[in-house]
Amino acid sequence: MPLTVNCPICKAPVEWVPQSAFKPFCSERCKLIDLGDWASEKHVIPVKAEFDPEAFDEFDLDKGDFFKE
C-alpha cells in the first residue's frame, strides 16, 4: 500500500509512487502555482543577514565611497 500525501496547494490526495509525475503535487497546475508563489516571494526561506548595516558606524567608514573602485 503506497504512502498517500495531500497536495500542498489543493489538498487532493497524492500517492507517493514513482508514477506520480508531479509529487508532492497532484497536477502540473498545482506545481506551477507553487512555483509562482516562490517566484513572487510569497514563500521565503528565512536566513540571518550576513551584513549588519549598523557595522558601518563601528568602522567609521564613509557610506558614500564604500562601493566605489
From Swiss-Prot:
Name the domain of life. Answer: Bacteria
* UniProt keyword annotation of Metal-binding present: yes
Q: Which Gene3D superfamilies match?
A: Erythroid Transcription Factor GATA-1, subunit A
Locate the coiled-coil region(s) and give their ranges. Answer: none
What does the entry list as the binding residues for Zn(2+)?
C7, C10, C26, C30
Co-factor: note: Binds 1 zinc ion.
Q: Report the record's Gene Ontology biological process terms.
A: regulation of DNA-templated transcription
Task: Name the coenzymes or cofactors required.
Answer: Zn(2+)
What keywords are assigned to this protein? Metal-binding, Zinc
Under Pfam families, the record lists: YacG (PF03884)
Gene Ontology molecular function: DNA topoisomerase type II (double strand cut, ATP-hydrolyzing) inhibitor activity; zinc ion binding
Q: Cross-referenced InterPro entries, in alphabetical order? A: DNA_gyrase_inhibitor_YacG, Znf_NHR/GATA
Which family is it part of?
Answer: Belongs to the DNA gyrase inhibitor YacG family.
- What is the recorded function of this protein according to its Swiss-Prot or TrEMBL entry? Inhibits all the catalytic activities of DNA gyrase by preventing its interaction with DNA. Acts by binding directly to the C-terminal domain of GyrB, which probably disrupts DNA binding by the gyrase.
Self-association state and partner proteins as the record states: Interacts with GyrB.
What is the protein named?
A: DNA gyrase inhibitor YacG
Which species?
Shewanella baltica (strain OS223)
Q: What gene is this protein translated from?
A: yacG
